Amino acid sequence: MLCDEEAQKRKAKESGMALPQGRLTFMDVAIEFSQEEWKSLDPGQRALYRDVMLENYRNLVFLGICLPDLSIISMLKQRREPLILQSQVKIVKNTDGRECVRSVNTGRSCVLGSNAENKPIKNQLGLTLEAHLSELQLFQAGRKIYRSNQVEKFTNHRSSVSPLQKISSSFTTHIFNKYRNDLIDFPLLPQEEKAYIRGKSYEYECSEDGEVFRVRASLTNHQVIHTAEKPYKCTECGKVFSRNSHLVEHWRIHTGQKPYKCSECDKVFNRNSNLARHQRIHTGEKPHKCNECGKAFRECSGLTTHLVIHTGEKPYKCNECGKNFRHKFSLTNHQRSHTAEKPYKCNECGKVFSLLSYLARHQIIHSTEKPYKCNECGRAFHKRPGLMAHLLIHTGEKPYKCNECDKVFGRKLYLTNHQRIHTGERPYKCNACGKVFNQNPHLSRHRKIHAGENSLRTLQME
Protein backbone atom coordinates (compact mmCIF):
# COMPACT_ATOMS: atom_id res chain seq x y z
CA MET A 1 0.00 0.00 0.00
CA LEU A 2 2.81 2.37 0.94
CA CYS A 3 4.78 1.46 -2.18
CA ASP A 4 1.75 2.20 -4.36
CA GLU A 5 1.33 5.60 -2.73
CA GLU A 6 5.01 6.47 -3.21
CA ALA A 7 4.89 5.29 -6.82
CA GLN A 8 1.85 7.46 -7.44
CA LYS A 9 3.67 10.47 -6.06
CA ARG A 10 6.74 9.82 -8.19
CA LYS A 11 4.53 9.57 -11.24
CA ALA A 12 2.82 12.81 -10.34
CA LYS A 13 6.19 14.54 -9.97
CA GLU A 14 7.34 13.32 -13.35
CA SER A 15 4.13 14.30 -15.12
CA GLY A 16 3.76 17.62 -13.28
CA MET A 17 0.14 16.83 -12.42
CA ALA A 18 -1.48 17.52 -9.07
CA LEU A 19 -1.95 14.70 -6.61
CA PRO A 20 -5.52 13.62 -5.90
CA GLN A 21 -6.92 14.99 -2.65
CA GLY A 22 -5.77 12.82 0.25
CA ARG A 23 -3.49 12.80 3.25
CA LEU A 24 -0.68 15.32 3.12
CA THR A 25 2.88 13.98 3.41
CA PHE A 26 6.10 15.70 4.33
CA MET A 27 7.41 15.76 0.77
CA ASP A 28 4.24 17.59 -0.35
CA VAL A 29 5.28 20.63 1.64
CA ALA A 30 9.07 20.26 1.53
CA ILE A 31 11.06 23.06 -0.04
CA GLU A 32 13.86 21.42 -2.05
CA PHE A 33 16.87 22.61 -4.04
CA SER A 34 19.44 20.98 -6.27
CA GLN A 35 23.09 20.87 -5.21
CA GLU A 36 23.93 23.87 -7.38
CA GLU A 37 21.05 25.89 -5.98
CA TRP A 38 21.97 24.94 -2.42
CA LYS A 39 25.52 26.21 -2.92
CA SER A 40 24.20 29.54 -4.17
CA LEU A 41 22.23 30.18 -0.95
CA ASP A 42 23.88 32.43 1.61
CA PRO A 43 24.17 31.27 5.30
CA GLY A 44 21.05 33.20 6.30
CA GLN A 45 18.94 31.50 3.61
CA ARG A 46 20.27 28.08 4.59
CA ALA A 47 19.44 28.70 8.25
CA LEU A 48 15.96 29.77 7.23
CA TYR A 49 15.58 26.63 5.12
CA ARG A 50 16.45 24.42 8.10
CA ASP A 51 14.01 26.25 10.38
CA VAL A 52 11.15 26.01 7.88
CA MET A 53 11.69 22.33 7.09
CA LEU A 54 11.88 21.36 10.76
CA GLU A 55 8.79 23.41 11.59
CA ASN A 56 6.79 21.79 8.78
CA TYR A 57 7.94 18.39 10.01
CA ARG A 58 6.76 19.13 13.55
CA ASN A 59 3.40 20.36 12.25
CA LEU A 60 2.81 17.16 10.29
CA VAL A 61 3.81 14.97 13.24
CA PHE A 62 1.28 16.88 15.32
CA LEU A 63 -1.41 16.17 12.72
CA GLY A 64 -0.55 12.46 12.84
CA ILE A 65 0.55 12.35 9.19
CA CYS A 66 2.79 9.47 8.06
CA LEU A 67 6.44 10.44 7.49
CA PRO A 68 8.23 7.57 5.69
CA ASP A 69 11.63 9.19 4.97
CA LEU A 70 13.25 10.94 7.94
CA SER A 71 16.85 11.02 6.72
CA ILE A 72 16.67 14.64 5.60
CA ILE A 73 15.18 15.67 8.96
CA SER A 74 17.95 13.83 10.82
CA MET A 75 20.55 15.78 8.87
CA LEU A 76 18.78 19.08 9.44
CA LYS A 77 18.58 18.48 13.20
CA GLN A 78 22.34 17.86 13.22
CA ARG A 79 22.77 21.05 11.16
CA ARG A 80 24.36 19.02 8.34
CA GLU A 81 23.71 19.86 4.71
CA PRO A 82 21.32 17.57 2.80
CA LEU A 83 23.12 15.27 0.39
CA ILE A 84 21.05 15.18 -2.79
CA LEU A 85 17.85 17.13 -3.25
CA GLN A 86 15.92 15.48 -6.02
CA SER A 87 13.21 18.05 -6.72
CA GLN A 88 14.37 21.27 -8.30
CA VAL A 89 12.82 24.64 -7.53
CA LYS A 90 14.71 27.57 -8.99
CA ILE A 91 14.60 31.22 -7.93
CA VAL A 92 15.29 33.14 -11.14
CA LYS A 93 14.72 36.56 -12.63
CA ASN A 94 12.41 36.94 -15.60
CA THR A 95 12.76 39.32 -18.53
CA ASP A 96 11.53 42.40 -16.66
CA GLY A 97 13.93 41.80 -13.75
CA ARG A 98 11.40 40.50 -11.25
CA GLU A 99 12.20 37.38 -9.19
CA CYS A 100 10.10 34.27 -9.68
CA VAL A 101 9.94 30.67 -8.45
CA ARG A 102 10.20 28.06 -11.19
CA SER A 103 9.83 24.28 -11.04
CA VAL A 104 12.43 22.67 -13.31
CA ASN A 105 10.30 19.55 -13.80
CA THR A 106 7.00 21.23 -14.62
CA GLY A 107 8.00 24.61 -15.90
CA ARG A 108 5.41 26.29 -13.68
CA SER A 109 6.47 29.61 -12.24
CA CYS A 110 5.12 32.44 -10.16
CA VAL A 111 6.33 36.02 -10.09
CA LEU A 112 7.46 37.25 -6.66
CA GLY A 113 7.16 41.00 -6.63
CA SER A 114 5.47 43.72 -4.58
CA ASN A 115 2.08 42.13 -5.12
CA ALA A 116 3.21 38.53 -4.64
CA GLU A 117 1.27 38.14 -1.43
CA ASN A 118 -1.98 38.36 -3.40
CA LYS A 119 -1.07 35.80 -6.09
CA PRO A 120 -1.35 32.01 -5.87
CA ILE A 121 1.86 29.92 -5.91
CA LYS A 122 1.89 26.38 -7.28
CA ASN A 123 4.64 23.96 -6.29
CA GLN A 124 5.85 21.05 -8.41
CA LEU A 125 2.93 18.88 -7.24
CA GLY A 126 0.28 21.40 -8.22
CA LEU A 127 -0.76 22.41 -4.69
CA THR A 128 -2.18 25.95 -4.78
CA LEU A 129 -0.95 28.07 -1.86
CA GLU A 130 -2.01 31.53 -0.71
CA ALA A 131 1.16 33.65 -0.55
CA HIS A 132 1.11 36.31 2.13
CA LEU A 133 3.36 37.56 4.94
CA SER A 134 0.92 37.71 7.84
CA GLU A 135 1.64 35.90 11.11
CA LEU A 136 0.78 32.21 10.96
CA GLN A 137 -1.44 30.42 13.44
CA LEU A 138 0.33 27.22 14.53
CA PHE A 139 -0.59 24.63 17.15
CA GLN A 140 1.29 22.14 19.33
CA ALA A 141 -0.26 19.43 21.53
CA GLY A 142 -0.52 20.23 25.21
CA ARG A 143 0.48 23.89 24.76
CA LYS A 144 -1.41 27.13 24.27
CA ILE A 145 -1.93 28.59 20.85
CA TYR A 146 0.93 30.81 19.95
CA ARG A 147 1.69 33.16 17.09
CA SER A 148 4.84 32.46 15.10
CA ASN A 149 6.16 34.14 12.01
CA GLN A 150 8.16 31.51 10.18
CA VAL A 151 10.71 34.02 8.96
CA GLU A 152 10.77 36.54 11.80
CA LYS A 153 14.44 36.04 12.71
CA PHE A 154 15.51 36.14 9.10
CA THR A 155 13.62 39.36 8.30
CA ASN A 156 15.26 41.10 11.24
CA HIS A 157 18.59 40.85 9.42
CA ARG A 158 17.41 41.58 5.88
CA SER A 159 15.81 44.72 4.55
CA SER A 160 13.74 42.98 1.88
CA VAL A 161 11.64 39.83 1.85
CA SER A 162 13.29 36.99 -0.04
CA PRO A 163 11.45 34.59 -2.38
CA LEU A 164 12.34 31.75 -0.01
CA GLN A 165 10.43 33.53 2.72
CA LYS A 166 7.36 33.80 0.53
CA ILE A 167 7.40 30.08 -0.25
CA SER A 168 7.84 28.99 3.37
CA SER A 169 5.06 31.27 4.54
CA SER A 170 2.77 29.97 1.83
CA PHE A 171 3.34 26.28 2.58
CA THR A 172 2.71 26.67 6.29
CA THR A 173 -0.43 28.72 5.67
CA HIS A 174 -1.68 26.02 3.35
CA ILE A 175 -1.32 23.37 6.07
CA PHE A 176 -3.36 25.43 8.50
CA ASN A 177 -6.12 26.35 6.02
CA LYS A 178 -6.51 22.90 4.53
CA TYR A 179 -6.43 20.93 7.79
CA ARG A 180 -8.32 23.37 10.01
CA ASN A 181 -11.18 20.88 10.54
CA ASP A 182 -8.75 18.05 11.31
CA LEU A 183 -7.25 20.21 14.03
CA ILE A 184 -10.66 20.81 15.57
CA ASP A 185 -11.30 17.05 15.75
CA PHE A 186 -7.82 16.26 17.09
CA PRO A 187 -8.41 14.53 20.49
CA LEU A 188 -5.34 15.92 22.30
CA LEU A 189 -6.01 19.56 21.47
CA PRO A 190 -7.45 21.51 24.47
CA GLN A 191 -10.95 22.95 24.11
CA GLU A 192 -9.84 26.60 24.23
CA GLU A 193 -7.45 25.97 21.31
CA LYS A 194 -10.17 24.27 19.25
CA ALA A 195 -12.41 27.25 19.91
CA TYR A 196 -9.64 29.58 18.73
CA ILE A 197 -9.42 27.66 15.43
CA ARG A 198 -13.15 28.17 14.95
CA GLY A 199 -12.56 31.88 15.39
CA LYS A 200 -14.24 32.07 18.79
CA SER A 201 -12.93 32.92 22.24
CA TYR A 202 -13.21 30.11 24.77
CA GLU A 203 -14.17 30.93 28.32
CA TYR A 204 -14.29 29.00 31.59
CA GLU A 205 -17.00 30.25 33.93
CA CYS A 206 -17.02 29.79 37.68
CA SER A 207 -20.31 28.14 38.69
CA GLU A 208 -20.22 29.90 42.08
CA ASP A 209 -19.91 33.58 41.19
CA GLY A 210 -20.00 33.65 37.38
CA GLU A 211 -16.46 35.03 36.98
CA VAL A 212 -15.00 34.11 33.60
CA PHE A 213 -11.47 32.91 32.77
CA ARG A 214 -9.78 32.13 29.44
CA VAL A 215 -7.52 29.43 30.88
CA ARG A 216 -8.69 26.42 32.86
CA ALA A 217 -5.78 26.70 35.30
CA SER A 218 -6.89 30.22 36.27
CA LEU A 219 -10.40 28.94 36.99
CA THR A 220 -9.02 26.11 39.14
CA ASN A 221 -6.88 28.55 41.09
CA HIS A 222 -9.88 30.86 41.59
CA GLN A 223 -12.24 28.12 42.77
CA VAL A 224 -10.13 27.54 45.88
CA ILE A 225 -11.82 30.68 47.25
CA HIS A 226 -15.22 28.96 47.24
CA THR A 227 -14.11 25.63 48.67
CA ALA A 228 -14.07 25.11 52.41
CA GLU A 229 -10.64 23.50 52.17
CA LYS A 230 -7.94 25.50 53.95
CA PRO A 231 -4.97 23.18 54.34
CA TYR A 232 -2.44 25.78 55.51
CA LYS A 233 -2.59 26.37 59.27
CA CYS A 234 -0.73 28.87 61.42
CA THR A 235 0.98 27.07 64.31
CA GLU A 236 0.86 30.20 66.47
CA CYS A 237 -2.82 31.15 66.44
CA GLY A 238 -4.46 28.27 64.56
CA LYS A 239 -5.81 30.42 61.73
CA VAL A 240 -6.15 28.51 58.45
CA PHE A 241 -5.63 29.62 54.86
CA SER A 242 -6.44 28.29 51.41
CA ARG A 243 -3.04 29.24 49.97
CA ASN A 244 0.49 28.95 51.26
CA SER A 245 1.32 32.51 50.17
CA HIS A 246 -1.46 33.81 52.45
CA LEU A 247 -0.01 31.87 55.38
CA VAL A 248 3.44 33.32 54.70
CA GLU A 249 2.01 36.85 54.75
CA HIS A 250 0.06 36.12 57.94
CA TRP A 251 3.11 34.65 59.66
CA ARG A 252 4.83 38.05 59.50
CA ILE A 253 2.27 39.35 62.00
CA HIS A 254 3.73 37.00 64.62
CA THR A 255 7.38 37.47 63.67
CA GLY A 256 7.11 41.22 63.18
CA GLN A 257 9.01 40.86 59.92
CA LYS A 258 8.60 43.76 57.52
CA PRO A 259 10.75 43.00 54.48
CA TYR A 260 9.36 45.69 52.19
CA LYS A 261 11.02 49.09 52.64
CA CYS A 262 10.10 52.43 51.09
CA SER A 263 13.12 53.96 49.35
CA GLU A 264 11.78 57.47 49.95
CA CYS A 265 11.10 57.54 53.70
CA ASP A 266 12.48 54.16 54.89
CA LYS A 267 9.09 53.09 56.23
CA VAL A 268 8.75 49.29 56.25
CA PHE A 269 5.78 47.02 55.50
CA ASN A 270 4.94 43.35 55.88
CA ARG A 271 3.25 43.17 52.46
CA ASN A 272 4.39 44.30 49.05
CA SER A 273 0.87 45.53 48.25
CA ASN A 274 0.97 47.81 51.30
CA LEU A 275 4.30 49.25 50.15
CA ALA A 276 2.91 49.88 46.66
CA ARG A 277 -0.09 51.65 48.17
CA HIS A 278 2.15 53.74 50.43
CA GLN A 279 4.47 54.81 47.61
CA ARG A 280 1.58 56.58 45.89
CA ILE A 281 1.86 59.21 48.63
CA HIS A 282 5.33 60.09 47.35
CA THR A 283 4.57 59.79 43.64
CA GLY A 284 1.20 61.50 43.85
CA GLU A 285 -0.26 58.72 41.71
CA LYS A 286 -4.03 58.41 41.86
CA PRO A 287 -4.97 55.59 39.50
CA HIS A 288 -8.62 55.25 40.55
CA LYS A 289 -10.67 57.92 38.77
CA CYS A 290 -14.36 58.78 39.06
CA ASN A 291 -16.04 58.78 35.65
CA GLU A 292 -18.70 61.21 36.85
CA CYS A 293 -16.64 64.15 38.13
CA GLY A 294 -13.05 63.17 37.30
CA LYS A 295 -11.87 63.12 40.90
CA ALA A 296 -9.03 60.64 41.43
CA PHE A 297 -8.05 58.52 44.41
CA ARG A 298 -4.98 56.62 45.51
CA GLU A 299 -6.97 53.56 46.58
CA CYS A 300 -9.98 51.74 45.16
CA SER A 301 -11.75 51.94 48.53
CA GLY A 302 -11.58 55.74 48.34
CA LEU A 303 -13.27 55.72 44.95
CA THR A 304 -15.95 53.31 46.17
CA THR A 305 -16.72 55.58 49.12
CA HIS A 306 -16.85 58.61 46.83
CA LEU A 307 -19.20 57.06 44.23
CA VAL A 308 -22.04 56.97 46.76
CA ILE A 309 -22.20 60.76 46.51
CA HIS A 310 -23.29 60.51 42.86
CA THR A 311 -25.71 57.62 43.29
CA GLY A 312 -27.35 59.04 46.43
CA GLU A 313 -27.51 55.53 47.81
CA LYS A 314 -27.65 55.12 51.58
CA PRO A 315 -27.38 51.37 52.16
CA TYR A 316 -26.52 51.44 55.87
CA LYS A 317 -29.60 51.63 58.11
CA CYS A 318 -29.81 52.11 61.87
CA ASN A 319 -31.97 49.41 63.46
CA GLU A 320 -32.89 51.70 66.34
CA CYS A 321 -34.27 54.76 64.56
CA GLY A 322 -34.34 53.72 60.88
CA LYS A 323 -31.97 56.47 59.76
CA ASN A 324 -29.91 55.66 56.65
CA PHE A 325 -26.26 56.44 55.97
CA ARG A 326 -24.00 56.41 52.94
CA HIS A 327 -21.03 54.90 54.73
CA LYS A 328 -20.65 52.16 57.31
CA PHE A 329 -18.41 54.28 59.55
CA SER A 330 -21.15 56.94 59.64
CA LEU A 331 -23.63 54.34 60.85
CA THR A 332 -21.16 53.09 63.47
CA ASN A 333 -20.65 56.61 64.77
CA HIS A 334 -24.40 57.23 64.82
CA GLN A 335 -25.18 54.03 66.72
CA ARG A 336 -23.12 55.27 69.64
CA SER A 337 -25.76 57.92 70.22
CA HIS A 338 -28.18 55.11 71.09
CA THR A 339 -25.78 53.03 73.14
CA ALA A 340 -24.08 55.96 74.90
CA GLU A 341 -20.76 54.28 74.08
CA LYS A 342 -17.84 56.69 74.34
CA PRO A 343 -14.64 54.84 73.48
CA TYR A 344 -12.43 57.90 72.97
CA LYS A 345 -10.87 59.30 76.14
CA CYS A 346 -8.88 62.50 76.67
CA ASN A 347 -5.55 61.75 78.34
CA GLU A 348 -5.44 65.23 79.87
CA CYS A 349 -8.73 65.40 81.76
CA GLY A 350 -10.26 61.93 81.35
CA LYS A 351 -13.34 63.16 79.48
CA VAL A 352 -14.78 60.60 77.05
CA PHE A 353 -16.34 61.04 73.61
CA SER A 354 -18.35 58.96 71.18
CA LEU A 355 -16.44 60.16 68.11
CA LEU A 356 -12.75 60.61 67.45
CA SER A 357 -13.47 63.99 65.85
CA TYR A 358 -15.12 65.13 69.09
CA LEU A 359 -12.03 64.14 71.05
CA ALA A 360 -9.76 65.96 68.59
CA ARG A 361 -11.90 69.08 68.89
CA HIS A 362 -11.86 68.83 72.69
CA GLN A 363 -8.10 68.40 72.94
CA ILE A 364 -7.61 71.85 71.46
CA ILE A 365 -8.95 73.21 74.76
CA HIS A 366 -5.85 71.93 76.52
CA SER A 367 -3.54 73.69 74.09
CA THR A 368 -2.87 77.37 74.78
CA GLU A 369 -2.63 78.47 71.16
CA LYS A 370 -5.72 80.22 69.75
CA PRO A 371 -4.65 81.75 66.46
CA TYR A 372 -8.12 82.78 65.23
CA LYS A 373 -9.19 86.06 66.85
CA CYS A 374 -12.41 88.04 66.47
CA ASN A 375 -11.72 91.67 65.51
CA GLU A 376 -15.02 92.77 67.05
CA CYS A 377 -14.70 91.50 70.63
CA GLY A 378 -11.21 90.03 70.77
CA ARG A 379 -12.36 86.49 71.50
CA ALA A 380 -9.93 83.89 70.19
CA PHE A 381 -10.56 80.41 68.81
CA HIS A 382 -8.49 77.33 68.20
CA LYS A 383 -9.99 76.68 64.75
CA ARG A 384 -11.26 78.83 61.92
CA PRO A 385 -14.78 77.23 61.88
CA GLY A 386 -15.20 78.34 65.50
CA LEU A 387 -14.38 81.92 64.56
CA MET A 388 -16.71 81.87 61.55
CA ALA A 389 -19.61 80.60 63.67
CA HIS A 390 -18.89 83.26 66.28
CA LEU A 391 -18.89 86.11 63.76
CA LEU A 392 -22.54 85.40 62.97
CA ILE A 393 -23.37 86.76 66.42
CA HIS A 394 -21.97 90.16 65.45
CA THR A 395 -23.37 90.23 61.94
CA GLY A 396 -26.77 88.83 62.93
CA GLU A 397 -26.66 86.66 59.81
CA LYS A 398 -28.72 83.49 59.90
CA PRO A 399 -28.05 81.63 56.66
CA TYR A 400 -29.79 78.35 57.51
CA LYS A 401 -33.52 78.39 56.74
CA CYS A 402 -36.19 75.80 57.51
CA ASN A 403 -38.19 74.87 54.40
CA GLU A 404 -41.25 74.01 56.49
CA CYS A 405 -41.77 77.16 58.56
CA ASP A 406 -39.17 79.57 57.15
CA LYS A 407 -37.48 79.95 60.51
CA VAL A 408 -33.79 80.86 60.21
CA PHE A 409 -30.77 79.82 62.24
CA GLY A 410 -27.20 80.92 62.64
CA ARG A 411 -25.81 77.37 62.68
CA LYS A 412 -26.62 74.25 60.70
CA LEU A 413 -26.75 72.19 63.90
CA TYR A 414 -29.58 74.37 65.18
CA LEU A 415 -31.50 73.89 61.93
CA THR A 416 -31.03 70.11 62.08
CA ASN A 417 -32.35 69.95 65.64
CA HIS A 418 -35.29 72.20 64.73
CA GLN A 419 -36.34 70.12 61.71
CA ARG A 420 -37.00 67.13 63.97
CA ILE A 421 -40.03 69.03 65.27
CA HIS A 422 -41.57 68.77 61.80
CA THR A 423 -40.43 65.22 61.03
CA GLY A 424 -41.21 63.85 64.49
CA GLU A 425 -37.84 62.12 64.51
CA ARG A 426 -36.57 61.17 67.96
CA PRO A 427 -33.26 59.40 67.46
CA TYR A 428 -32.04 59.54 71.05
CA LYS A 429 -33.36 56.71 73.22
CA CYS A 430 -32.92 56.06 76.92
CA ASN A 431 -31.73 52.50 77.50
CA ALA A 432 -33.14 52.49 81.04
CA CYS A 433 -36.80 53.29 80.36
CA GLY A 434 -37.07 53.40 76.54
CA LYS A 435 -38.08 57.06 76.36
CA VAL A 436 -36.99 58.85 73.15
CA PHE A 437 -35.89 62.42 72.48
CA ASN A 438 -35.27 64.60 69.44
CA GLN A 439 -32.06 66.13 70.81
CA ASN A 440 -29.08 64.62 72.58
CA PRO A 441 -29.00 67.28 75.36
CA HIS A 442 -32.58 66.33 76.28
CA LEU A 443 -31.51 62.71 76.64
CA SER A 444 -28.53 63.72 78.77
CA ARG A 445 -30.79 65.69 81.12
CA HIS A 446 -33.21 62.78 81.31
CA ARG A 447 -30.48 60.30 82.24
CA LYS A 448 -29.74 62.34 85.34
CA ILE A 449 -33.17 61.34 86.62
CA HIS A 450 -32.15 57.69 86.55
CA ALA A 451 -28.78 58.57 88.03
CA GLY A 452 -30.55 60.38 90.90
CA GLU A 453 -32.90 57.47 91.42
CA ASN A 454 -29.97 55.10 91.63
CA SER A 455 -28.21 57.36 94.15
CA LEU A 456 -31.36 57.62 96.28
CA ARG A 457 -31.87 53.88 96.12
CA THR A 458 -28.28 53.34 97.25
CA LEU A 459 -28.74 55.69 100.22
CA GLN A 460 -31.95 53.94 101.26
CA MET A 461 -30.23 50.56 101.14
CA GLU A 462 -27.49 51.88 103.40
UniProtKB/Swiss-Prot annotation:
One of its GO terms (biological process) is regulation of transcription by RNA polymerase II. Pfam families: KRAB, zf-C2H2, zf-H2C2_2. PROSITE patterns: KRAB (PS50805), ZINC_FINGER_C2H2_1 (PS00028), ZINC_FINGER_C2H2_2 (PS50157). Disulfide bonds: none annotated. Its main location: nucleus. Belongs to the krueppel C2H2-type zinc-finger protein family. This is Zinc finger protein 610. It comes from Homo sapiens. The gene is ZNF610.
